[in-house]
A protein has these predicted regions:
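Buried, small/hydrophobic-residue-enriched core segments of structured protein domains
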Residues: 1-11, 15, 19
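Intrinsically disordered, low-complexity regulatory tails and linkers that flank structured modules
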Residues: 1-5, 161-172
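Catalytic cores of peptidoglycan-degrading enzymes
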Residues: 13-166
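Short, solvent-exposed mixed-charge patches
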Residues: 177-180
Length: 180
């Protein structure tokens, strides 16, 4: 699973979700319940964030989860939905293409490449439309309070505490030698 980093309380310093699941140039459209739609020319809620990026820029899974939808959705074009624990779902739309290894039911980890930026569906140019759902409510991915990743496993907490104390003692000895 790679390296993980924890604070002195055993809490993971990494978040459970990536706020922006790709390398992007700028935000071309913010979360806005009263946005003027650029193609339909009428007020229509924009329930996500549009990250402008070059076509075929890799799109990563924002967090660990299971692909609950992969295919085309009206307006969104090529779309992926991922269900995460805690009643959270993320949506990725206007994609150029999907990672060919993925299908509905595939498990993904945070940072896995799931697709590539495009302009499928009703889009004015290449970008990722990204939504973050809590239950049935869409929230602003830029402003939502993201949960931390899992803390130190309870079965490893004693070992973690012992290692922490050992390293704190070493730091204190070093500081005493340096300043003493």
């Amino acid at each position: 699973q790679g390296k993980q980093y924890f604070n002195e309380n055993g809490e993971n310093v990494k978040k459970a979700f990536l706020r922006a699941p790709l390398d992007f140039a700028y935000i071309s459209s913010h979360f806005n319940p009263n946005r003027m739609h650029p193609i339909l020319h009428k007020i229509k809620a924009h329930n996500g964030v549009d990250y402008a990026a070059k076509r075929n820029t890799p799109v990563k899974a924002s967090g660990d989860g299971v692909i609950s939808f992969i295919g085309k959705q009206r307006g969104y074009g090529r779309t992926i939905e991922i269900k995460h624990g805690g009643n959270i779902k993320t949506l990725y739309a206007h994609l150029e293409r999907f990672n060919s290894k993925l299908k509905q039911g595939s498990k993904v980890k945070q940072g896995d490449i799931i697709a590539y930026v495009g302009d499928s569906g009703q889009a004015t140019g290449p970008h990722l439309h990204f939504e973050f759902w809590k239950g049935e409510i869409r929230t602003d991915p830029v402003k939502v309070k993201l949960p931390s990743a899992k803390p130190v496993n309870i079965s490893q907490k004693d070992d973690f505490d012992n290692l922490l104390q050992l390293n704190l003692n070493k730091l204190n000895q070093y500081n005493l030698k340096k300043n003493g």
